[in-house]
Amino acid sequence: MGVSNMKEMDCVEVIVEDDSYAKEGVHQGMQGWICDSRCINGRWLVIIPQYGEKENIATLPIKEEDLVLLPGGMDARINERIRGMIFISDCIYSVH
C-alpha cells in the first residue's frame, strides 16, 4: 500500500457491504470519522456515530480500501436511515 491520503479526524464513508462490519451494525453507505492517527495493517479505527447524543453504532477497524474520504464532512442521520432500512429488511425476510 502506498502513502495514505487519510488521517485522524477525517470523515469517511464505508463503500462496501462486508459481513465482519455488518456483525458490528455497520453497512455500506454509513459515515464516520477516523479516531486514531495510526493505520494498522491497512485498517483505520473508525467511529460510526448516530445523530445527536445517542450512543455510537460502532468503533471498529475498517480497511482503507473500504473507505472513501468525505471532504465536506459527514451526516450521522444517514447512518440511522441505513440502520432503519436494514431493520425493516430483516423483519420482512424473517416473516417468510
Enumerate the predicted regions with their spans.
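Intrinsically disordered, low-complexity linker and terminal regions at domain boundaries
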Residues: 78-81
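Basic/aromatic-rich interaction segments and small domains that mediate binding to polyanionic partners
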Residues: 2, 7-75, 89, 93-96
